[in-house]
Amino acid sequence: MIPEPAIVVCTTNARCLDVLKASVKAYVPRNIRTYYFHGVGATFGEAYNHAARIAFKEHDQIVICNDDIVFTPTTWRTLLADVALLKEAVADLGYVAARSDYARGAQNIRSGTGRLDFLRFESERSIIETPVIAPICAWIHRDAWVDFPPINWFSDDVQCADMKRRHFISRAYVHHVGSQTCGNDAAKCMADAEPWLKANRPALHAVHFGRV
């Protein structure tokens, strides 16, 4: 097995891919292998299940990346430093995900807490545990991996719960354009996911749709 983590990217329209590639080239060590998959699977989950299976044949660990993110000069170094710390402290480690400016909950830098210090919230200096992360740019080990469900919205919730692992938000940051895969029609995204959730995860369905 190759000891270094691989970067795994799935893309549909590839509108932002050139910028991601440029930032990877500029800020990620040259020995890190990157896998790009275009037009695989009908959903986000199906695409990344396919991509992870291929990458895990040669790597014990991968970093899942959306195609519409941009690395900073410190993203890779900080993310892997936090992974190393957590490996020592957490036996059942799941995802370790970068923060961004377009993410849910505490993973979004706008949700920071504490005083502002050089335009960053104090909380951005800390690793934070959370039950669900969005793998916009997220490290995961093959031993923790379980497949995504065949849906777009709420696939993160399902996968993170099915892993039965502890997930963390890193101090690392990536810029995220957002809504390039599923689009901006929230009502449609909700409606597309509802039948699968109702049939397979009724408790989660009740949380988001208010009925079983």
Model-assigned labels for residue ranges:
Residues G39-A47, A52, N152-F154:
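A short, glycine-/small-residue-rich helix N-cap motif at loop->alpha-helix starts
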Residues N49-Q61:
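Active-site nucleotide-sugar/metal-binding loop of Leloir-type enzymes
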Residues W76-Y95:
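Conserved donor-nucleotide/metal-binding helix-loop-beta segment in metal-dependent transferases, i.e.
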Residues G94-S111:
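Short beta-strand-to-loop element that shapes/binds the nucleotide-sugar donor at the catalytic cleft/hinge
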Residues L119-I140:
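A recurrent flexible, glycine/aromatic-enriched loop bordering the glycosyltransferase active site
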Residues P150-V212:
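C-terminal catalytic/acceptor-binding lobe
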